[in-house]
């Protein structure tokens, strides 16, 4: 995967890690149709490339991570998003694209509106001290129904309502976002946050790809099921892994004091 320096999405492969950078810094890294298509293609490539174990997404520049939709560039009327179902119209975040691999979001600056999708839909979120959050939908007469619903999983109803109902009248600090659990880790600067994400990615890359994929599915499912339902679903995922070579390779490598040789094929059987 590659992209020109002028592309709205920069893609770099660093060993087993794909680094995606929203590249419209002069426009707040806002989302355009071209960028949305590039994101969808990138997520699908990441999920289907066995050499990629983990992905990082961040924004270019020093001020913004992502300020949401570039409204003037998005067709909302007849023949556009208005006539599309949710799954067809929303295919740009890792969760929307059903990415089975771990995704780390590095929030390097202000995030508003649609940019919150990446925060809500990533597996691990690393913020920096200037990474404030806003949701200005209602201030411009729009409904906050998607990003805010995703934030409920991370921070609860109160935090999501505070952002959604106050609109541009409330700006959540990065420290507050960390305290609420929206950010999993908080670093002083954007550079520090990206370095931390790369360190996490290196650790993640050493693990069994299939075990991580099933663990991720089980944990995300717990946000959608009742407690008994989540346990039953998790049990079935756990049992399905027993037939995979990594189930045997992990303990064997540990006993032999060597680095495991993981099998990236989810359909492999021992």
Located regions from the model:
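Amphipathic alpha-helical segments at domain termini/boundaries
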Residues: 1-23, 164, 169-205, 213-224, ...
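Conserved CoA-thioester-binding segment of acyl-CoA-metabolizing enzymes
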Residues: 1-58, 62, 270
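Short loop-to-helix capping motifs
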Residues: 24-25, 49, 207, 244, ...
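An acidic, glycine-rich surface segment that forms the CoA-thioester-binding/catalytic face
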Residues: 36-38, 44-48, 71-112, 145-155, ...
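Short, active-site-adjacent cap segments at secondary-structure transitions
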Residues: 62-66, 112, 134, 219
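Crotonase-fold acyl-CoA enzyme core
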Residues: 97-209, 258
């Amino acid at each position: 995967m590659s992209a020109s320096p002028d592309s709205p999405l920069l893609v770099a492969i660093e060993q087993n890690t794909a680094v995606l950078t929203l590249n419209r810094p002069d426009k707040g890294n806002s989302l355009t149709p071209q960028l949305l298509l590039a994101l969808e293609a990138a997520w699908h490539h990441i999920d289907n490339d066995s050499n990629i174990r983990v992905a990082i997404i961040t924004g270019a520049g020093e001020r913004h991570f992502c300020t949401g939709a570039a409204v003037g560039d998005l067709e909302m009327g007849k023949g556009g998003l208005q006539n599309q179902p949710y799954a067809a119209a929303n295919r740009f975040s890792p969760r929307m694209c059903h990415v089975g691999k771990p995704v780390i979001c590095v929030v390097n600056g202000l995030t508003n509106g649609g940019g919150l999708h990446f925060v809500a839909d990533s597996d691990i979120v690393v913020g920096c001290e200037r990474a404030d959050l806003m949701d200005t939908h209602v201030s411009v007469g729009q409904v906050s129904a998607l990003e805010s619903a995703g934030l409920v999983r991370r921070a609860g109803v109160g935090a999501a309502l505070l952002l959604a109902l106050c609109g541009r009248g409330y700006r959540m600090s990065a420290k507050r976002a960390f305290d609420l659990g929206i950010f999993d880790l908080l670093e002083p600067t954007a550079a520090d946050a990206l370095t931390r994400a790369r360190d996490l990615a290196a650790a993640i890359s050493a693990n069994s790809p299939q075990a991580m994929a099933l663990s991720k599915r089980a944990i995300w499912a717990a946000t959608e099921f009742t407690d008994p339902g989540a346990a039953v679903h998790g049990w079935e995922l756990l049992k399905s892994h027993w037939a995979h070579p990594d189930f045997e390779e992990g303990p064997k490598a540990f006993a032999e004091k060597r680095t495991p040789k993981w099998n990236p094929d989810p359909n492999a059987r021992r």
